[in-house]
Amino acid sequence: VDARSAALVRANFRSVIEAPNGSERLVSAFYGHLFAENPQLRELFPPAMDMQAKRIVTAIQYVLDHLEDWGRAQKFLEQLARDHRKYGVDAAHYDAAGRALLSAFRAYNGAAWHRGLEEGWRDITILISASMAIGANSDKSQPFWEATVVGHRRVLEDLAIVRLQSESPIPYQAGQYVPLTVPQRPKMWRYFSPAIPANPYGEIEFHIRKIRGGWVSPAIVNETRVGDRWQIAGPLGGLHVDRESGRDVLMIGAGTGIAPLRAQLIEMGQRGINPRVHFFIGGRYPCDLYDVENMWQLSQSNPWLTIVPVCEQKTNPWWYPHPPQEEPYGMHRRLIGNLGAVVASFGAWADRQIQIAGSAKMIADTRRALIAVGTPEHIISSDPV
């Protein structure tokens, strides 16, 4: 894709996502064309397609952001195709998906469509469909594993820690996330990061918070029972500590976003030599730092790890039923303020490799705060959310 075409499709896509209901209209047109041409594909997907719409827009944006670094975009698309194997989608379906996506952009733009957009989006959709077909063909492993719930602990009213055991180990790396579906909401795949590294016993743990208005997370927190069988698909994402870089590490996690960072730290604790790590754990209230004591205990036996708790509010909300928890002796005092602003107040951290995990807003705000004080953008890593 040449520079002119890249600029043209980026501007066009920006006009789509900035328009009222633009993303929803585009994705609705995409699925309309896809299922009209391939009605057998409809039964592979859940009845509610709202999350699919968000993922499609996020994926297109990622590709457009990395056209000049196509190797990175291709790796992302191949991984995305491997993920779609859980639906029963295979390599043969991606040509149809590419045609449907081009038709969706053509229909959305209407009279504003012209030859330059046709050629630019045609090239982009061909690249996307070809890369995803390669990804689908490259993975011969099983599309998902079954795991049994062996523990469900309600840490807060809206947060649960769920432990499961699969019959065989699930091959993920600490820091990755996995799609899963639960019996209470079949076919509704959602993405969560394991909070512990993979082990040979098939044990896996998730920290899950209810999303207001969500379908799956409230069912997991409120309705999960020991003995439930979950399906867990292959891993995605690339958060990791680069041990060859020679750089120390800054980790910034909020709420259940600590899970992928926590898993990496536990795995690092099993090694003899590690880079220094500063781990800022954030939450709105002190009670949101539900795992800070466990992380503090980990730091006690691993002197390379420093834990720094951060809260927006000094005290718990009035409805929280438990007395204030005493901070472990010797832990860094709790800092008060916005997590990103607090971290940025210490400087640019330009000599670190930086990972951010949390909500989309938290990641964006923290990234912006760091860049504003001089942090090089290329040293900051986060997963698309």
Locations of regions flagged by a protein language model:
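Core of compact, soluble alpha-helical bundle domains
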Residues: V1-W145
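Short, conserved phosphate/pyrophosphate- and ester-handling motifs at nucleotide-, phospho-/glycolipid
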Residues: G175, G257, S359
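Conserved beta-strand elements of the Class I
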Residues: V249-L250, Q355
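A short, basic/flexible loop-to-alpha-helix module at the beginning of a structural domain
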Residues: G234-G246
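Histidine-anchored nucleotide/phosphate-binding helix
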Residues: P260-Q270
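Ferredoxin-reductase
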Residues: S141-R229, R247, G283-R284, V310-K314
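Reductase modules of NAD(P)H-dependent flavoproteins
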Residues: V16, R276-V385
